[in-house]
């Protein structure tokens, strides 16, 4: 086990001043488990984690004490004149197996989806991924559970870090997390199990947009979760809509607020 500590404004104790600096200093051998303790503070960083076998945990009393924050968004025009798009808007990109995030807040601060479009907080395309007691905050497309679907609807729609990667399904587990947004704020193709989580709608829209591949047994499973409203009117939101034809979403023993439309799900023009 190799342990590292990150603190705002690194001191003589050997702490790293940023997560990006800690990532660069991790042991090269991926078989060595690494734990990164992150001291309370706000870390304005856009992160990519490509090394397996890593645990990142906030050292504060609650997940709101340790915040990873960035504000990229889909409608932003890049230097080449092309919009940033959904999959380059992430705050934290994880593309490695056996990663655990614990007691952290990961947020995309871009804001209103009508103005800024898609803005991913956490882009998780990985196997045996765990988020424990985390807050994942955004508006549209807050949490992407990769992989991408096999084909995009329009050219350049998947532009981002895994657009050319093999579509390998991963298993993801979210426990005691708070996840918020408005439009399609939990989306993707992974097999993902949400247990004891609060799924908070900030406005009219859709909590999920699964793209479960054909033949995959499970998509999203919500167990003992609470679908809550934070500023969302009555019957103005749906549990989800299918991003692709074989989307699978299951709820077990969940509490559903009055903001959810009686139909539960929207068909997004699909049969």
Name each region found by the language model.
Residues 1-271:
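Sequence-level preference for short, compositionally simple segments enriched
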């Amino acid at each position: 086990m190799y342990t590292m500590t990150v603190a705002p404004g690194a001191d003589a104790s050997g702490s790293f001043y940023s997560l990006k600096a800690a990532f660069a200093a991790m042991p090269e051998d991926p078989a060595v488990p690494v734990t990164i303790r992150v001291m309370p503070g706000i870390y304005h960083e856009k992160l990519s984690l490509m090394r397996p076998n890593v645990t990142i945990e906030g050292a504060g009393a609650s997940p709101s004490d340790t915040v990873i924050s960035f504000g990229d968004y889909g409608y932003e025009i890049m230097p080449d004149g092309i919009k940033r798009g959904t999959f380059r808007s992430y705050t934290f990109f994880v593309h490695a197996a056996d990663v655990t995030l614990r007691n952290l807040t990961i947020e995309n601060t871009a804001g209103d989806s009508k103005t800024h479009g898609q803005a991913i907080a956490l882009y998780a395309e990985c196997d045996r991924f765990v988020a424990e007691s985390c807050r994942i905050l955004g508006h549209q497309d807050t949490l992407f559970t990769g992989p991408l679907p096999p084909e995009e609807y329009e050219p350049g729609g998947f532009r981002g870090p895994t657009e050319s990667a093999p579509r390998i399904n991963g298993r993801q587990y979210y426990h005691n997390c708070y996840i918020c947004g408005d439009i399609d704020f939990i989306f993707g193709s992974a097999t993902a199990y949400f247990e004891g989580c609060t799924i908070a709608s900030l406005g009219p829209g859709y909590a999920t947009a699964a793209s479960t591949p054909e033949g995959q047994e499970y998509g999203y499973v919500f167990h003992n979760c609470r679908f809550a409203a934070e500023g969302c009117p009555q019957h103005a939101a749906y549990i989800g809509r299918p991003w692709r034809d074989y989307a699978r979403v299951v709820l077990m023993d969940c509490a559903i607020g009055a903001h959810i439309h009686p139909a539960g799900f929207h068909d997004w023009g699909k049969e």
